[in-house]
Amino acid sequence: MRALLGICVLALVTPAVLGRTMDRCSLAREMANMGVSRDQLSKWACIAEHESSYRTGVVGPPNTDGSNDYGIFQINDMYWCQPSSGKFSHNGCDVSCNALLTDDIKSSVRCALKVLGQQGWSAWSTWHYCSGYLPPIDDCFV
């Protein structure tokens, strides 16, 4: 029983161990290198700050509909990624939710751009924090 408890605890903390914590500049530079428009980078930095504190390995607590949000941009598993549990997902980004928890943010960025294209910035519940002040990113490229 004790071994089972240890395995369960390990399974719960594994995504946090696999992820990394970025900052506004490391995120802005990586996204710019991936071709994301520079005029959007402050907005993405704001979303990442408020959704995950720039942490890539975060799985959010269950939402009221039972879904969870994954990764640096907290992408929802009911609509955008396939959870490892096998529960139904529309999987609009055609990606596993676990792929959104790794150090490599390419899958997260691709999926977030798709969400933005279909739902706009208001797809993120924290967007209201970003509609006024945006974190500066110009100093990230000096």
Swiss-Prot record:
It catalyses: Hydrolysis of (1->4)-beta-linkages between N-acetylmuramic acid and N-acetyl-D-glucosamine residues in a peptidoglycan and between N-acetyl-D-glucosamine residues in chitodextrins. It is an enzyme of class 3 (hydrolase). Residues 20-142 form the C-type lysozyme domain. Changing G6T: In strain: G140. Disulfide bonds join C25-C140, C46-C130, C81-C97, C93-C111. The active site is at E51, D69. GO terms for biological process: defense response to Gram-negative bacterium; killing of cells of another organism. Gene3D superfamilies: 1.10.530.10. GO terms for cellular component: extracellular space. Keywords: Antimicrobial, Bacteriolytic enzyme, Disulfide bond, Glycosidase, Hydrolase, Signal. Residues 1-19 form the signal peptide. Its EC number is 3.2.1.17. It comes from the Eukaryota. Found in the midgut. GO terms for molecular function: lysozyme activity. Pfam families: Lys. The keyword Transmembrane does not apply. InterPro entries: Glyco_hydro_22 (IPR001916), Glyco_hydro_22_CS (IPR019799), Glyco_hydro_22_lys (IPR000974), Lysozyme-like_dom_sf (IPR023346). Belongs to the glycosyl hydrolase 22 family. Unlikely to play an active role in the humoral immune defense. May have a function in the digestion of bacteria in the food. May be involved in the clearance of bacteria from the larval gut before metamorphosis. This is Lysozyme X. It comes from Drosophila melanogaster (Fruit fly).
